[in-house]
């Protein structure tokens, strides 16, 4: 079930005037989310032809005049990431050639974000390459949610709005009135994210799962830094991919005496064997994610809760269009 989190945002905006220049188009990767955003904004999705030729090439044609318009292109670059990325680039190019005044690429999920630096010789920094492609295609601005690496914003020489799914996740957790809460980072790299999350939850205590290898060819040892005994642990991450890290962390928290374990993440990548790990492990009371990436019915399981970020994205798009503050949404 997808729950719409309306707080702290309105359920819909006031009606736009007939002569407004805001246009919203959807790629094929998450049309359901795009429809929700369009309802929040009170506008229809722009008409567009998308098709694939027999040889696999993609084709896009905008079906209305967008000359002088402020155009927003919704396209999370999730699986199949290369097809969805290429479709986004073609959409941007089509809008540029149609004389749009401003083109904003809206990426609720930014694929290739984990390839943000070289970890070995002769590697590509693919997150930077994607930034170059989006810019060169003709985007004037990018709007993305919960980047795996915040420094990706610096890969762009155009305005970049980085928004967070935490208001939606936190609002839902507050509604559950969980007692003895402790926010847990599944690794040292996620401490800043977990700390900010804990602060919004009435300064809840913070714990960290620390991985360290004692010697070469020796398995990693996991330690919990912080007190979780008898507490409700909320594991917070930007994404759940194969679910190995978060299940490993939950298992350790249970061993250390946590009474309940919840998992929270913005992006449900859910690469195999994530569904089997999350649903069959019995480790989690609830796995809470958002709908930045579509989750097919066959990948849903009883412990899964999907929260909608449509209102948050819609409000952000409206504020950008109206040249209002975006950062004030997250204070």
Swiss-Prot record:
Annotated positions binding D-ribose 5-phosphate: 213, 237, 241-245
Pathway: Metabolic intermediate biosynthesis; 5-phospho-alpha-D-ribose 1-diphosphate biosynthesis; 5-phospho-alpha-D-ribose 1-diphosphate from D-ribose 5-phosphate (route I): step 1/1
Active site, UniProt feature: 211
Residues engaged in binding Mg(2+) 2: 187
Keywords: ATP-binding, Cytoplasm, Kinase, Magnesium, Metal-binding, Nucleotide biosynthesis, Nucleotide-binding, Transferase
InterPro entries: PRib_PP_synth_CS, Pribosyltran_N, PRibTrfase_dom, PRTase-like, Rib-P_diPkinase, Rib-P_diPkinase_bac
GO terms for MF: ATP binding; kinase activity; magnesium ion binding; ribose phosphate diphosphokinase activity
Residues in the signal sequence: none
Major subcellular site: cytoplasm
Gene3D superfamilies: 3.40.50.2020
Enzyme Commission code: 2.7.6.1
SUPFAM superfamilies in UniProt: PRTase-like
Reported cofactor(s): Mg(2+)
GO BP of this protein: 5-phosphoribose 1-diphosphate biosynthetic process; purine nucleotide biosynthetic process; ribonucleoside monophosphate biosynthetic process
Top EC class for this record: transferase
Binding site for Mg(2+) 1: 148
Reactions the enzyme catalyzes: D-ribose 5-phosphate + ATP = 5-phospho-alpha-D-ribose 1-diphosphate + AMP + H(+)
Location of this chain's protein in the cell: Cytoplasm
GO terms under cellular component: cytoplasm; ribose phosphate diphosphokinase complex
Manner of cofactor binding, per the entry note: Binds 2 Mg(2+) ions per subunit.
Binding positions (ATP): 55-57
PANTHER family: RIBOSE-PHOSPHATE DIPHOSPHOKINASE FAMILY MEMBER, RIBOSE-PHOSPHATE PYROPHOSPHOKINASE 1, CHLOROPLASTIC
Functional description taken from the UniProt entry: Involved in the biosynthesis of the central metabolite phospho-alpha-D-ribosyl-1-pyrophosphate (PRPP) via the transfer of pyrophosphoryl group from ATP to 1-hydroxyl of ribose-5-phosphate (Rib-5-P).
Binding partners and assembly: Homohexamer.
Family membership: Belongs to the ribose-phosphate pyrophosphokinase family. Class I subfamily.
Name of protein: Ribose-phosphate pyrophosphokinase
Organism field: Synechococcus elongatus (strain ATCC 33912 / PCC 7942 / FACHB-805)
Gene assigned in the entry: prs
């Amino acid at each position: 079930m997808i729950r719409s989190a309306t707080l702290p945002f309105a359920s819909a905006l006031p009606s736009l005037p007939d002569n407004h220049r805001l246009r919203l188009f959807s790629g094929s990767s998450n049309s359901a989310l795009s429809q929700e955003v369009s309802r929040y904004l009170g506008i229809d999705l722009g008409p567009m032809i998308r098709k694939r030729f027999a040889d696999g090439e993609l084709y896009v044609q905008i079906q209305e005049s967008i000359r002088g318009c402020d155009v927003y292109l919704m396209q999370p670059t999730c699986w199949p990431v290369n097809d969805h990325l290429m479709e986004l680039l073609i959409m941007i190019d089509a809008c540029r050639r149609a004389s749009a005044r401003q083109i904003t690429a809206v990426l609720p999920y930014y694929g290739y974000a984990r390839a943000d630096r070289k970890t070995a010789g002769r590697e590509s920094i693919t997150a930077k390459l994607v930034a170059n492609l989006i810019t060169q295609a003709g985007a004037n601005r990018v709007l993305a949610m919960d980047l795996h690496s915040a420094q990706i914003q610096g890969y762009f020489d155009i305005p970049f709005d980085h928004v967070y799914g935490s208001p939606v996740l936190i609002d839902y957790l507050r509604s559950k009135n969980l007692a003895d809460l402790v926010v847990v980072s599944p690794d040292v790299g996620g401490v800043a994210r977990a700390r900010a999350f804990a602060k919004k939850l009435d300064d809840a205590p913070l714990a960290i799962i620390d991985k360290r290898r004692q010697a070469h060819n020796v398995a990693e040892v996991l330690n919990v830094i912080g007190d979780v005994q008898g507490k409700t642990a909320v594991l917070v991450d930007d994404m759940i991919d194969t679910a190995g890290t978060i299940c490993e962390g939950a298992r350790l928290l249970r061993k250390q005496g946590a009474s309940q374990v919840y998992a929270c993440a913005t992006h449900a990548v859910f690469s195999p064997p994530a569904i089997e790990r999350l649903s069959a492990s019995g480790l989690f009371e609830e796995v809470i994610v958002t709908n930045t990436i579509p989750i097919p019915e066959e990948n849903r399981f009883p412990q899964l809760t999907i929260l909608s970020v449509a209102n948050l994205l819609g409000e952000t798009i409206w504020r950008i269009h109206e040249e209002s503050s975006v950062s004030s949404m997250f204070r």
